[in-house]
Amino acid sequence: MSNQDRGGPSSDLTRITDVETGLFDATFFAVTLDKRVATARRGLRPLALALLEPVTEVASDQPSPAIDREVASSVVETLRDSDIACRLTGDRVAVILEDTPENGAVWTIERVRRRLAESPRPVTLRAGVACY
């Protein structure tokens, strides 16, 4: 019997993970962001939040699952272990970067953008960064 069958740790992880991308979900993001901001405030440490959204050539209300997976993969491969990526609504991804000032956050997101631009199916990325 696996941990998932017993309601063990992997079962808990699936409750907070987006099935399509493997990123944490919006609920996990909301709780985690509050905690990380409080920690940054207490320790007077920098914290950055980046919001990412792929830009598609075709106007559509429906996000593309393949593009969403490509964005998620590029984000995860670029981030440090301490950083957190979460899928919000549709094709939007939020990234929490602890101990990261504005220039570090911009540099990190630029690395994600370049990785996506050089992928077999290039993706254009719209991004914004906010810092504490």
Regions found by a protein language model. Name each.
Residues A48, R87-E98, R121-Y132:
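A short glycine-enriched loop-to-beta-strand structural element that forms part of the catalytic core
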Residues N3, G8, R45, Q62-S64, ...:
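Intrinsic-disorder/low-complexity coil detector
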Residues L44-P46, S82, T124:
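A structure-centric signal for secondary-structure junctions around beta-strands
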Residues D12, T17-L51, V55-E77, C86-G90, ...:
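Conserved long alpha-helical elements within nucleotide-processing catalytic cores of c-di-GMP signaling
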Residues L97-E102, L116-A117:
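Hydrophobic, well-ordered secondary-structure segments
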Residues T39, E77-I84, R113-P122:
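Short catalytic/binding micro-motifs of nucleotide second-messenger systems
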Residues M1-S10, R111-R114, T124, C131:
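Regulatory sensory/coupling modules that transmit signals to nucleotide-handling catalytic cores
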Residues S2-P9, A50, D81-I84:
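Short low-complexity stretches enriched in small and charged residues
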